[in-house]
Amino acid sequence: MTTSYAKIEITGTLTVLTGLQIGAGDGFSAIGAVDKPVVRDPLSRLPMIPGTSLKGKVRTLLSRQYGADTETFYRKPNEDHAHIRRLFGDTEEYMTGRLVFRDTKLTNKDDLEARGAKTLTEVKFENAINRVTAKANLRQMERVIPGSEFAFSLVYEVSFGTPGEEQKASLPSSDEIIEDFNAIARGLKLLELDYLGGSGTRGYGQVKFSNLKARAAVGALDGSLLEKLNHELAAV
């Protein structure tokens, strides 16, 4: 199946379909400044998507689905289904998850500018009205513009053992790896049907994954297994 140690990299494109707002924090803002700026790469100043945002959202969505399947409500991450903890980790068991979500960088800046984009973000004005006093509260929300494409990268580590078991000196079976990739594909599909970032119930944060492909980045992987893993990803 594999060598004694392996890392499988999943790459693809994450496309923003509706304005994306992943905030850079609630620090001090000068009068007239945007209330909620987006997070940016500190060097290029281009918009980025933190791996923490992707990991947290996918884990939450998968936990809900596993809970619905087993009629269980998981109140805390450490109470998640064993399969979820195997992929994302368990702090109480001191177990690192098999998945590593990378920060994603904008890749089509030149294309967006060629298509007429003056800036890579937009400022959307929103107004909350107090029902009692009718007082307005105008807010400025910075959003990554639709059509922005980001280089998606996720690393799956072939590791040992599962939550609640002793760490065994044996690699997971091919069936277990395929099961994990099925869960990864379902998590990404659930994200497409949900939203990333804030204000998703108001239309923000719809995204789409494309060109997903798995490859053996470290170690050897049987060709037939790799084909099956890519078949799972094709379902997204």
UniProtKB/Swiss-Prot annotation:
Keyword Nucleus: no
Disruption phenotype: Deletion of the entire CRISPR-Cas locus (cas6 to cas2, Rv2824c to Rv2816c) decreases resistance to plasmids encoding spacer elements about 6-fold.
Disulfide pairings: none
GO terms (BP aspect): defense response to virus
Source species, domain of life: Bacteria
Record GO terms (molecular function): endonuclease activity; RNA binding
Sequence intervals crossing the membrane: none
InterPro entries referenced in this protein's UniProt entry, alphabetically: CRISPR-assoc_RAMP_Csm3, CRISPR_Csm3_endoribonuclease, RAMP_III_fam
Enzyme Commission designation: 3.1.-.-
Function: CRISPR (clustered regularly interspaced short palindromic repeat) is an adaptive immune system that provides protection against mobile genetic elements (viruses, transposable elements and conjugative plasmids). CRISPR clusters contain spacers, sequences complementary to antecedent mobile elements, and target invading nucleic acids. CRISPR clusters are transcribed and processed into CRISPR RNA (crRNA). This subunit has the target ssRNA endonuclease activity; it cleaves multiple sites in the target RNA at 6 nucleotide intervals.
Entries under NCBIfam families matching the protein: cas7_TM1809
Complex formation: Part of the Csm effector complex that includes Cas10, Csm2, Csm3, Csm4 and Csm5.
Protein name: CRISPR system Cms endoribonuclease Csm3
Organism: Mycobacterium tuberculosis (strain ATCC 25618 / H37Rv)
Gene designation per UniProt: csm3
